[in-house]
């Protein structure tokens, strides 16, 4: 029997959503001439930017800390002299964090929060600004803006169904400007050129930033493909740009002629996530192809082979990662990268074993797969719970782990109940 009250509430919600959509469309039909119109109060903006650096830049690296903060100080002193590309970076940083900054009081506009609504306005304005930029020369700032735009969309669940398409588009953009190639080749190609701007483009600082951004883009694309159920586009590509170094931003100066030596993985830096993640990238990409390619049928022995390789990668994690896996407190800066390193490998154990776990009641050999699925799903949910308990909601918005793991747990319980009843 249909509840009349529930029916009226649903009707009112639909009407409210449609009215807000029309109002939003009218408001955004006017092109924003100056991006600085959308900037928040400096105190509020500084808090959100600091939060971004404590959370987001501990995993996917887009910006260089000293360079950014130097420009931000100049912006605070002389806002009128700030370039539009830096304004776009500020807007997108704020857009990335507005929905997860717990200290802000939540209010609503229509069916969405004011924070999300204003973040989406900034996203749309920056997207429009990017479309008007020349492609003759692509600066490192424009590349950073494109990556931040993608992350901001994911953090605000904006155009969720387009996530994989936009990740693939971002990857193609990176390929088009040669981020996947060895920066040393650029020096050889322009060695005889006297243009100082070109020489500066291949400085040690920019070489490392190119590697970081490329590593970030391929990680985002692989995860988007995994969530969508497609093989990653990176499978058919080869890159020779190398992996990022395990060095902190304070050691990477813009005028550096040479990079300092990369620290061992046991030493945590803000770049540790990308460095350690790159070691298992080929394996994760291969497993993603096996899971999502309908022409591939993985035998159980083959499954156990990939299970063994995945466990080896998990066991090779440095001590600081293992500490966070065992510790319930996830408030430190290194907690998010540590737990994400574990989650992004364990998610493959879940989907590799799931097809066999479904038949555990008919073949006792597959009972192991059911146990692996339960353990993997439970561990992933525990990691997310730790982060949420510490006030960090980043992965909840950026990934689908909680939904996927919860479904796997429910499915396993239902299968177990059906076997019990028989």
Task: Locate each region found by the language model.
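Intrinsic, low-complexity transcriptional activation domains
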Residues: 1-57, 80, 84-89, 94
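Extended, leucine-rich alpha-helical cores of fungal transcription factors
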Residues: 31-46, 72-94, 99, 108-186, ...
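Charged, glycine/proline-rich intrinsically disordered loops and linkers
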Residues: 2, 6, 10-16, 186-197, ...
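Acidic, Ser/Thr/Pro-rich intrinsically disordered transcriptional activation regions
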Residues: 51-83, 323
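Amphipathic helix-loop-helix modules that constitute alpha-helical solenoid scaffolds
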Residues: 22, 211, 215, 245-247, ...
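Conserved small-domain helix->loop->beta segment predominantly found in fold-type I
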Residues: 321-328
């Amino acid at each position: 029997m249909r509840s009349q009250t529930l029916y009226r509430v649903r009707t009112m919600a639909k009407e409210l959503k449609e009215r807000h959509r029309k109002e939003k469309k009218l408001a955004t039909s006017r092109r924003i001439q100056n991006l600085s119109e959308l900037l928040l109060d400096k105190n509020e903006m500084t808090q959100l930017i600091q939060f971004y650096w404590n959370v987001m830049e501990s995993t996917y690296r887009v910006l260089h800390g000293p360079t950014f903060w130097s420009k931000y100080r100049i912006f605070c002193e002389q806002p009128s002299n700030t370039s539009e590309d830096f304004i776009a970076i500020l807007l997108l940083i704020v857009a990335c964090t507005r929905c997860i900054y717990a200290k802000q009081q939540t209010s609503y506009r229509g069916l969405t929060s004011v924070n999300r609504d204003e973040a989406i306005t900034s996203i749309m304005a920056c997207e429009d600004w990017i479309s008007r930029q020349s492609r003759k020369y692509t600066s490192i700032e424009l590349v950073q803006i494109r990556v931040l735009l993608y992350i901001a969309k994911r953090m605000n669940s904006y155009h969720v169904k387009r996530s994989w398409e936009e990740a693939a588009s971002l990857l193609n953009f990176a390929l088009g400007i040669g981020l996947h190639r060895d920066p040393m080749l650029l020096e050889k190609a322009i060695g005889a050129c006297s243009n100082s701007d070109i020489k500066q483009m291949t400085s040690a600082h920019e070489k490392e930033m190119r590697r970081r951004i490329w590593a970030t883009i391929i990680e985002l694309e692989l995860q988007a493909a995994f969530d969508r159920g497609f093989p990653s586009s990176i499978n058919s590509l080869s890159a020779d740009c190398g992996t990022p170094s395990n060095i902190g931003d304070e050691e990477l100066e813009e005028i550096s002629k040479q990079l300092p030596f990369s620290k061992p993985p046991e030493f945590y830096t803000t770049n540790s996530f990308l460095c350690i993640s790159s070691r298992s990238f080929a394996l994760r990409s291969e497993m993603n192809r096996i899971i999502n390619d309908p022409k591939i049928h993985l035998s159980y022995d083959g499954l156990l082979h990939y299970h063994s390789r995945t466990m080896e990668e998990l066991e090779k994690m440095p001590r600081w990662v293992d500490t966070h896996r065992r510790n319930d407190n996830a408030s430190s800066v290194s907690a998010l990268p540590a737990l994400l390193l574990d989650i992004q490998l364990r998610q493959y154990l879940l989907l590799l074993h799931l097809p066999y776990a479904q038949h555990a009641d008919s073949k006792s050999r597959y009972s192991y797969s059911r146990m692996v699925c339960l353990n993997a799903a439970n561990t992933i949910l525990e990691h997310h719970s730790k982060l949420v308990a510490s006030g960090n909601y980043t992965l909840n918005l950026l990934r689908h782990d909680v939904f996927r793991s919860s479904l796997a747990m429910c499915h396993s319980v239902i299968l177990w109940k059906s076997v019990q009843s028989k």
